[in-house]
C-alpha cells in the first residue's frame, strides 16, 4: 500500500514535525586529512573582522598582535570585533544593579573552590596539547609530562597537589631563561626474528634531554593545538577547534568556575543547566513576557543567530569584565583570574600537520609540515590556498600563527554567556526608558530575544536598539539568519517551542541501537535509552514497544545470539543450541545466551539478570554470576555504570545504567599495535599511574577516603594508613603478632628506600 507522506502531517503543527527535517539518521560526516586549511581560515577571518584595530608586537615572542578594542564602530552590517570597553563595563554595572550582590557572592564561592581544587581536576578531558612532545595526548598523560618537566626544573610547588600551587609553577616557569624538557624519539634497526628467521624492523624508544630558551618555551605555553571538528551534521564545510595546553587549562578552569557561579544566578542563562531544567527556565521567561503583554502590548520573539561569535569575542574584553567583577576582592584572587584572558590575548594557534602533496605522474606523496609554510615557494599551491598562506605569513612563528583577537571554540562559554545576558538585562523598561522592552535567553552563542511593545514600530525600534547594543559589545546578530515570529513559536539550542516545548526526537536517534561495549552493558544501555526517551522525549508506548523489538533484533544480530530454537545459522548457533537443549527453564537464559526477550515497556528499569533470576536453572546461575568463575568480570563493578552518549548536538552526555557483573561483562584487551609505536612509553606510564591509583584506592576505600589534609605524598599517606590499620587489626585480634611485625618492618623499609632516593 502506498502512503502519501504529506497525509501524515495534515493534523500535525509544523513545529511538531520538526524532527523529520533534522539530518540525524545515518553516519555523521568525518574529516580526513589535516586541519591546517581550516585553522588558517579561522586565523585569517578573525584578523579580517578586527582589521581596523591597532598592531603591536609581543616583546617576549616577537609575535605581531592586532588589538581591535575600542576600535572604529562598523558603519554597516558587517561582523566586527570592535567592542567598546566603557560599554562592556557599564553593562556589567547594570547587571550588578539588577542582581545585587551577584558578583560578590560568586567571587566568595569561587575563592573556596580555588583553594580546594586538586591538580587532578586537569586530568578530565580528552585530547590535550602536550607542549613537552608538541602534539596531542590524553589529558592525564599531558599533565603528568608537564609536572615531570616542572620537577626536573626545580619547580616543586605542585607537589602539594593543589591546583593553585601547580599554577604558581606555571607562572614561575614563564620567567625562566631556559626550560629543560625530555623528548621521545624512535630508533629503528633491522634484526632477524629468531622464530620466523625473517628480517624485521625493531623500534626502540629513546628519551633525550633538550633545552628550550625563554622565547620557545613561551610560544609553546601559549599554543593552542588545532584539530578539525568531527561529526558535525548539517554543514557542508568543516571547521577547526582548539585544544589548549596544560599551562592555560588551570587558569581557564577558575575563570569558568566564577562565570558558572554567576550564570547559575541569572534567569536568562541557558548554561550551566541542561535538559528539562533548561526547558523549565526558558518556559519561565516566555511566561513572564506573555503575561505582561496581555491586551495593551504585542510580543514578538527572535530566534537569534550570531555571526562568528568566537571570532569576534576578545580576551581583552574578558579581562575588563573580570577586573570589574572582582574589583573588591583580594589581590591574589584578582591576579589568578586575570591570567587566563592575558594568556589568550597572546595566544598562538598551531597550524596542525601541514599539507599533503601527491604527484599522480610520479606516484609520490609528500607532506609539507606547517613549519615550512613560512618560506616555501607558493607555485605548488592552488589559488585559494595561495591566498590563505600569503595572508597568514606575517603572523607565523615556528609553524604557529599569532592569534591575539578572537576566542577559539568552547573556551569561555560561561563568561561569554554572562556578556550576552548583560545585554538582555538592559531590556528592562527602567533602562530602555521608552514603551518597548525586551528579555530573552542566552546560552553561549545561541540566543532567543523576546520584545514587547504597544505596536509594530515599537517592536522594530526595540530590535534595532538591541542590535546596536550588541555591536558595542562585539556581538554581531546576523540579520540574514535570525527570524522573528509572534511569541509562542521559536527555537533555542535546538529546543523548539510552540506554546510549550515540542520533543525533537530526531536528536536522540544516534543513541538508539547497540553501543558496542559488551553484551551486558549493551543490553542495559539499550533499554535505558528507550526508558529515558519515554520519560523525556514523548516516545509513546506503541513506538517504544516497536523500538524495543527492533533493538532486541539488532542486539541478536550484533552478538549472533539468536534464540536457541531459531533456524538462523551463525558461528555461535551450535553452542547456543547445545545450551538451549540442556536448559530446563529456557525463559531464564539471557538474550545473549540465546534466551527469549522478557522486556516490555513496563520493566525497562530492571537489569536483565535480575528480571530472569528466579527463572534460571541453578547451575546456569552458578556459571553466570559466580565470583570464582574466571570469566566473570572482576572490575569492581559499581551498581551504576556510566555510558557516554553522543547526542546529535552538544557535548557527550553521561548516561547512567544498571550494571550486574556476569560472564558477559567482559573488557576487551588493548590493541597490540600500539606497543610497537612511539606511544609505547606513554602506555607504560599510563599503566604505572593506573597501578599506583589502584593501590592507593586499596588503602583508602572510597567510603573512608578524605582528601589528604596537609602536604604528604601518596606513599607517605599509604604507609601511615597501613600502620594505623595494622595496629587496629592486631589489637582486635584479626591478625597475629608475626603478621603485625612483618607489616611494620615493610613500612620502615619503604620509608628507608624513599630517603635513599
Curated annotation (Swiss-Prot):
UniProt motif Nuclear localization signal: location: 187-195, 203-216
One Pfam entry name: Flu_PB1
Where in or outside the cell?
Host nucleus; Host cytoplasm
For biological process, the GO terms are: DNA-templated transcription; symbiont-mediated suppression of host gene expression; symbiont-mediated suppression of host mRNA transcription via inhibition of RNA polymerase II activity; viral RNA genome replication; viral transcription
Q: Which Gene3D superfamilies match?
A: 6.10.140.720
Please write the reaction equations for the catalytic activity of this protein.
Answer: RNA(n) + a ribonucleoside 5'-triphosphate = RNA(n+1) + diphosphate
One Gene Ontology cellular component term attached to this UniProt record is: host cell cytoplasm
> Taking every annotated instance into account, which residue ranges of this chain make up the domain RdRp catalytic?
286-483
From what superkingdom does this record's organism come? Viruses
Annotated region Promoter-binding site: where?
A: 249-256
Q: Which UniProt keywords apply?
A: Eukaryotic host gene expression shutoff by virus, Eukaryotic host transcription shutoff by virus, Host cytoplasm, Host gene expression shutoff by virus, Host nucleus, Host-virus interaction, Inhibition of host RNA polymerase II by virus, Nucleotide-binding, Nucleotidyltransferase, Phosphoprotein, RNA-directed RNA polymerase, Transferase, Viral RNA replication, Viral transcription
EC annotation?
Answer: 2.7.7.48
| Region listing for Disordered, in residue ranges | 53-82
Which principal EC class is assigned to this enzyme? Answer: transferase
Q: Name the principal localization, coarsely classed.
A: host cell
- GO MF: nucleotide binding; RNA binding; RNA-directed RNA polymerase activity
PTM section of the record: Phosphorylated by host PRKCA.
Question: Which cysteine pairs are covalently linked by disulfides here?
Answer: none
Q: Which family does it belong to?
A: Belongs to the influenza viruses polymerase PB1 family.
- Reported function: RNA-dependent RNA polymerase which is responsible for replication and transcription of virus RNA segments. The transcription of viral mRNAs occurs by a unique mechanism called cap-snatching. 5' methylated caps of cellular mRNAs are cleaved after 10-13 nucleotides by PA. In turn, these short capped RNAs are used as primers by PB1 for transcription of viral mRNAs. During virus replication, PB1 initiates RNA synthesis and copy vRNA into complementary RNA (cRNA) which in turn serves as a template for the production of more vRNAs.
| UniProt subunit comment | Influenza RNA polymerase is composed of three subunits: PB1, PB2 and PA. Interacts (via N-terminus) with PA (via C-terminus). Interacts (via C-terminus) with PB2 (via N-terminus); this interaction is essential for transcription initiation. Interacts (via C-terminus) with human PKP2 (via N-terminus); the interaction competitively inhibits the interaction between the RNA polymerase subunits PB1 and PB2.
Q: What is this protein called?
A: RNA-directed RNA polymerase catalytic subunit
Q: Which organism is it from?
A: Influenza A virus (strain A/USA:Memphis/10/1996 H1N1)
Amino acid at each position: 500500500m502506498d502512503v502519501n507522506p504529506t497525509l501524515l502531517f495534515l493534523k500535525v503543527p509544523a513545529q511538531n514535525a520538526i524532527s523529520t527535517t533534522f539530518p540525524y539518521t545515518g553516519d555523521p560526516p568525518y574529516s580526513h586529512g589535516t586541519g591546517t586549511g581550516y585553522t588558517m581560515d579561522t586565523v585569517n577571518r578573525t584578523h579580517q573582522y578586527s582589521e581596523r584595530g591597532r598592531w603591536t608586537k609581543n616583546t617576549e615572542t616577537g609575535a605581531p598582535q592586532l588589538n581591535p578594542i575600542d576600535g572604529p564602530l562598523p558603519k554597516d552590517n558587517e561582523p566586527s570585533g570592535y567592542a567598546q570597553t566603557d560599554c562592556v563595563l557599564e553593562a556589567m554595572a547594570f547587571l550588578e544593579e539588577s542582581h545585587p550582590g551577584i558578583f560578590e557572592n560568586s567571587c566568595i564561592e569561587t575563592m573556596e573552590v580555588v583553594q580546594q581544587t586538586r591538580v587532578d581536576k586537569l586530568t578530565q578531558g580528552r585530547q590535550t596539547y602536550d607542549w613537552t612532545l608538541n602534539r596531542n595526548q590524553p589529558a592525564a598523560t599531558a599533565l603528568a609530562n608537564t609536572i615531570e618537566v616542572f620537577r626536573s626544573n626545580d619547580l616543586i610547588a605542585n607537589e602539594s597537589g593543589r591546583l593553585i600551587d601547580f599554577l604558581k609553577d606555571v607562572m614561575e616557569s614563564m620567567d625562566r631563561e631556559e626550560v629543560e624538557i625530555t623528548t621521545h624519539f624512535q630508533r629503528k634497526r633491522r634484526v632477524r626474528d629468531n622464530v620466523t628467521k625473517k628480517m624485521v624492523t625493531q623500534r626502540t624508544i629513546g628519551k633525550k634531554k633538550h633545552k628550550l630558551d625563554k622565547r620557545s618555551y613561551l610560544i609553546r605555553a601559549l599554543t593552542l593545538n588545532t584539530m578539525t571538528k568531527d561529526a558535525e551534521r548539517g554543514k557542508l564545510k568543516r571547521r577547526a577547534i582548539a585544544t589548549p595546553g596544560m599551562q592555560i587549562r588551570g587558569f581557564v578552569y577558575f575563570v569558568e568556575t566564577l562565570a558558572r557561579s554567576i550564570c547559575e544566578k541569572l534567569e536568562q542563562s541557558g548554561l550551566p543547566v541542561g535538559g528539562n531544567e533548561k526547558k523549565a527556565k526558558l518556559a519561565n521567561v516566555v511566561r513572564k513576557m506573555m503575561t505582561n503583554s496581555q491586551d495593551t502590548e504585542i510580543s514578538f520573539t527572535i530566534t537569534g543567530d550570531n555571526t562568528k561569535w568566537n571570532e569576534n569575542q576578545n580576551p581583552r574584553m574578558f579581562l575588563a569584565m573580570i577586573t570589574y567583577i572582582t574589583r573588591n576582592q583580594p589581590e591574589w584572587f584578582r591576579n589568578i583570574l586575570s591570567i587566563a584572558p592575558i594568556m589568550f590575548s597572546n595566544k598562538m594557534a598551531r597550524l596542525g600537520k601541514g599539507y599533503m602533496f601527491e604527484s599522480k605522474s610520479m606516484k609520490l606523496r609528500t607532506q609539507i609540515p606547517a613549519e615550512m609554510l613560512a618560506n616555501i615557494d607558493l607555485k605548488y599551491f592552488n589559488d585559494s590556498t595561495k591566498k590563505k598562506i600569503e595572508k597568514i605569513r606575517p603572523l607565523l612563528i615556528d609553524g604557529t600563527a599569532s592569534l591575539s583577537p578572537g576566542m577559539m571554540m568552547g573556551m569561555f562559554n560561561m563568561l561569554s554567556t554572562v556578556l550576552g545576558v548583560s545585554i538582555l538585562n538592559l531590556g528592562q523598561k527602567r533602562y530602555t526608558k521608552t514603551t518597548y522592552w525586551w528579555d530573552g535567553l542566552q546560552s553561549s552563542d545561541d540566543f532567543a530575544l523576546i520584545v514587547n511593545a504597544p505596536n509594530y514600530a515599537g517592536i522594530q525600534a526595540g530590535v534595532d536598539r538591541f542590535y546596536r547594543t550588541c555591536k558595542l559589545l562585539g556581538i554581531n546578530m546576523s540579520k540574514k539568519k535570525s527570524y522573528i515570529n509572534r511569541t509562542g513559536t521559536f527555537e533555542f539550542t535546538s529546543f523548539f517551542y510552540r506554546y510549550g516545548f515540542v520533543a525533537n526526537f530526531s536528536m536522540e536517534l544516534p543513541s538508539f541501537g547497540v553501543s558496542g561495549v559488551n553484551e551486558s552493558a549493551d543490553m542495559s544501555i539499550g533499554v535505558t535509552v528507550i526508558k529515558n526517551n519515554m520519560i523525556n522525549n514523548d516516545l509513546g508506548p506503541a513506538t517504544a514497544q516497536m523500538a524495543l523489538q527492533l533493538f532486541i533484533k539488532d542486539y541478536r544480530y550484533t552478538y549472533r545470539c539468536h534464540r536457541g530454537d531459531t533456524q538462523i545459522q551463525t558461528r555461535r548457533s551450535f553452542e547456543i543450541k547445545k545450551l538451549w537443549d540442556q536448559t530446563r527453564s529456557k525463559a531464564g537464559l539471557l538474550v545473549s545466551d540465546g534466551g527469549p526477550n522478557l522486556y516490555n515497556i513496563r520493566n525497562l528499569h530492571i537489569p536483565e539478570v535480575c528480571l530472569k533470576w528466579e527463572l534460571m536453572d541453578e547451575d546456569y546461575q552458578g556459571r553466570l554470576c559466580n565470583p570464582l568463575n574466571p570469566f566473570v568480570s572482576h572490575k569492581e563493578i559499581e551498581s551504576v555504570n556510566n555510558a557516554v552518549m553522543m547526542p546529535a548536538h552538544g557535548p557527550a552526555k553521561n548516561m547512567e545504567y544498571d550494571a550486574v557483573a556476569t560472564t558477559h561483562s567482559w573488557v576487551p584487551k588493548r590493541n597490540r599495535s600500539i606497543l610497537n609505536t612511539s606511544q609505547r612509553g606513554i602506555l607504560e606510564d599510563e599503566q604505572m599511574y593506573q597501578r599506583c591509583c589502584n593501590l592507593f584506592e586499596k588503602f583508602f576505600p572510597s567510603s573512608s577516603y578524605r582528601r589528604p589534609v596537609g602536604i604528604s605524598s601518596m606513599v607517605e599517606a599509604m604507609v601511615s594508613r597501613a600502620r594505623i590499620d595494622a595496629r587496629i587489626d592486631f589489637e582486635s585480634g584479626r591478625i597475629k603478632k608475626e603478621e603485625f611485625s612483618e607489616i611494620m618492618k615493610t613500612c620502615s623499609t619503604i620509608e628507608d628506600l624513599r630517603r635513599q632516593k
